[in-house]
Amino acid sequence: MAGGQELIEQIRKELEPVEAQLRDHQYVRALEQNEIARDSLSVIVGEQHITIESDLRSLAAMVARCDHPRSRRFFLGTLPGEDAAFGALHDLATALGLDEPWLQAYEPTPEAQAYAHYVAWLAHYASPAEMATALAVNFPAWGANCGRVGAALREKYGLTEEATAFFDLFSGPTPSEFEEEVRRVVDDGLHHGVGEAQLRRAARLLQSYELMFWDGVYQASTAQ
C-alpha cells in the first residue's frame, strides 16, 4: 500500500487532464485580455463570498469531528487563512462598489457553488484523510489561478494590491509545511482503514467541482 505522499502524487498524476483545464481556463484568460466587463467582476466576488463563508463553517465542523489531535491541528490551522481571505474579499467588494446588502442579496449559480457544497459534505460525512487529500490535490491549480487573477485585476482593471489581496493570499505554490501535514493526516487515515479508493474519489470530485466553479463564473460573467 502506498504511503500518504506517494498516494497524493499518484492522484495528482491521474487528475492531470482536469488540472490542465483549470490552469488554462477561459475565465482567467478572458481577464488577462480585459474581456470581462468591469461590472461583471461582481460575479466572482459574489460567488466567492458564499464559498469562503461556507468553507469557514465546513472547516470548523471538521475540526469538531476530528478524533486524532494531528488531524484536528491541521484543520484548525486552515481557519486563520480562510478568515483572512474572507476579510480581504470584503476589501475587493468595496473597491468594486459592492456593499454588504449587495453581497447578502447575491444569487449564486449552481455550477459555481458545487465546490462549496461538496466541501461541506466532506466536512460532515467524510474522514479527515479524504478531506485533506482533496484539498491538497486542489490547492495547486487554485493557487496558480488566483495568482493570475490578482495580476490581471491590477494590470487590466486598475485595482490596487490592497483590493486584490484576496487572490494573493492563495497564490503561489503550496507550502511544504502544508504538504507534510497533509501527508501525516493521510497516513493516519490509511492506518485506520480509510481506503485508497475513497481518497481518490474525494480528490476527483472536488477537482471536478473546482472546474465547475470557474465554468459557472465565466458563464455568469459573460451573460451579463
Language-model-detected regions and their locations in the chain:
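Active-site-proximal alpha-helical scaffolds that flank and shape metal-associated catalytic sites
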Residues: 70-173, 208
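Long amphipathic all-alpha helical oligomerization modules
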Residues: 172-203, 215
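Charged/polar positions within long, soluble alpha-helices
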Residues: 53, 57-60, 87, 91-94, ...
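Acidic, carboxylate-rich catalytic segments that either coordinate divalent cations
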Residues: 2, 193-224
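Short, hydrophobic/aromatic alpha-helical segments in well-folded domains
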Residues: 44-47, 58-61, 74, 118, ...
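Alpha-helical bundle segments that constitute or directly flank the non-heme di-iron/ferroxidase center
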Residues: 13-23, 31-65, 130-147, 207-214
